[in-house]
Amino acid sequence: MASGEGFVVWFTGLSGSGKSTLAAMLAAELPRRGVHVESLDGDVVRTHLSKGLGFSREDRDTNIRRIGFVARLVARSGACAITAAISPYREIRDEQRRAIGRFCEVYCECPLDVLERRDIKGLYARARAGEIKGFTGVDDPYEPPRSPEVIVHTDRESPREGLARILAKLEELGYVRPMAQPAEPARAGLAPPHGGELVDRFVRGDARQRLLERVAGLPRVRLDERGASDLELIGNGAYSPLKGFMTSRDYLRVVRERRLESGLVWSIPITLAVPGEDAARLSLGSEVALASPDGRVVGVLELVDRWTPDKEVEARNVYGATDEGHPGVAYLRSSGDVYLGGEVWLIERPLSPQFPEYPRDPAATRAAFEARGWRRVVGFQTRNPIHRAHEHITKCALEITDGLLLHPLVGATKAGDIPADVRMRCYELLLEKYYPADRVVLGLYPAAMRYAGPREAIFHALVRKNYGCSHFIVGRDHAGVGRFYGTYDAQRAFDDFLPSELGIEPLKFEEAFWSTVVGGMATDKTAPGGPETRITLSGTQVRELLRAGKLPPPEFSRPEVAQILLSATQGRGHDQAA
């Protein structure tokens, strides 16, 4: 802190204008500048400090005075208090400014029509319909600040642009020092898990026996394959910091802002969907037995939330589509219409482990990296065989890291994707012949594909952070399907977040190909020549060759890998290849 004195950053603006997002980003950045931060989110304050207050003018003012009082105490202690509350009335905001002194007001300005289009919670629509009275911006006034320190136009500025201007103002005010760029010290160990702690929800020993005795009398929900995969990945810590299926508060914020309620970056909703008639027989506050697809009771849900989501909004925000030609949208619409939320405990793995000789838990991969002395580990996610282009980018990444986690997805995929057993034979052969054995760990990621493109790319990176990776490869159309996403949309998604928020560095690669000009693998950045000098094939072209009993050219795929695919295609009658 520039002077050692505390200060308050007060975010104000209409509901949905981006206050909480910017507040969370600022809270993640200031500790890097030596500033201790305490956050006061308006929604959280109303459920605790201001519980019981309504929305009259008097109650609103009381709520803001309470927030201001706590913020002032935080600032007096030498820390920064970040508040994010609508705080609609100018007079009460100015009262807090006078009382606090070192005060930076940030107005998140956004036109009302934009906010109503963004309205994932449906609050504006309910207010327009008269279901919510005294709703700020509809039938209760919002008084914009006259002279805020910063105005962020959240309808046309990215969160990163807004954050940069807030930080610049804090530097100008002398509240924080300009960011120095010292050489980063060598890490003493692997990157910490997302949220700081590797979750473990498996029960063992006597606790497991007691849980087994209890589940017999519990109502039961049977999981599908995706739900079973999600349960295992919650249990083994791959989805850290999640300890269960999301509640509505986390879900809504993830769908709207790609963040958990805590402000932590998280881009994919992890939910448990059930039919309405099943949900109706379950009581909040009770336990629910979770059964695997084959009927085994494998865990327990502590049910604390139940709600009916707006699946059209979820489809648009998460998948960028509402067309059922998108497999993620099709799955969403076919799943149960009620979501259940709460923490889980696992008795056993929900799915029978495939390929048990390979690590599938974050604790196991982290132990493998530690045993090898690795600190900088790059993760590579794949649901396809590794052809020459993939080999090229993974080896480029190995040049700047200690080791590679080759991490194929072995959960549910769409029709037409290559079966896991065929892909595993390809990986094993390729690693044996073409990679240094001491630089690669082959692990398993037992998740279902969602085909959510840019959002899933962020999600895959955060999960690999939990597995111990410091870097993550993002190629062309990561986690894409069909023509739903642009070629490099997934790479651009990482630009929406600060590196300190993600805690894992994306390695962005352009499409690789065999160049006849340079006689090797290259990209647009490294090889001259037009399309006629490049050897690359689409998935459709590869499938046509394999159906005809022909191998793809060696410039595209290692002959040994191509032979495995040819044998599998001919033997199974599949038209599957990639």
Swiss-Prot record:
It is an enzyme of class 2 (transferase). In the N-terminal section; belongs to the APS kinase family. In the C-terminal section; belongs to the sulfate adenylyltransferase family. Coiled coil: none annotated. This is Probable bifunctional SAT/APS kinase 1. The lineage of its organism: Bacteria, Pseudomonadati, Myxococcota, Polyangia, Polyangiales. One of its GO terms (molecular function) is ATP binding. Pfam families: APS_kinase, ATP-sulfurylase, PUA_2. Its EC number is 2.7.1.25, 2.7.7.4. GO terms for cellular component: cytoplasm. It comes from Sorangium cellulosum (strain So ce56) (Polyangium cellulosum (strain So ce56)).
